[in-house]
């Protein structure tokens, strides 16, 4: 199964890479590897991850970094709505649900 980013989620992902790389050279690369491993698991079995508070929105946690990938499946494509840090305000991304509708 393929995936696509909501533009704001793509920005969150890129910001996270830059943040970790600025803290320690190579840590951003580690984050990318962990993120990609999570997406491989999500794309292989998207419905196996728990539902978030919203209907049809799933949450997959990165194992090493404090982030969740919030997504839904529409037309056989995983739509990534947010790459959310665990300490960020819950639900800040909810406005993206309608914007990302297809």
Placement of each model-derived feature along the sequence:
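Arg/Lys-rich, positively charged N-terminal/basic patches that mediate binding to nucleic acids
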Residues: 1-34
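General helical secondary-structure elements
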Residues: 19, 55, 59-60, 83-85
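Hydrophobic residues in alpha-helical segments
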Residues: 20, 42-43
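Basic/aromatic recognition patch in beta-strand/loop cores that engages polyanionic ligands
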Residues: 37, 44-78
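Low-complexity, flexible helical/coil segments
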Residues: 41-42, 97
């Amino acid at each position: 199964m393929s995936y696509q980013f909501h533009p704001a989620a793509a920005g969150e992902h890129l910001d996270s890479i830059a943040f970790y790389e600025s803290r320690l050279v190579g840590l951003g690369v580690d984050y990318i590897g962990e993120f990609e491993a999570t997406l491989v698991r999500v794309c292989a079995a998207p419905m196996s991850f728990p539902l978030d508070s919203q209907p049809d929105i799933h949450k997959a946690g990165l194992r090493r970094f404090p982030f969740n990938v919030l997504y839904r499946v529409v037309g056989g494509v995983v739509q990534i709505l947010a790459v959310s840090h665990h300490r960020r305000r819950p639900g800040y991304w909810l406005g993206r649900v309608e914007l990302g509708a297809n």
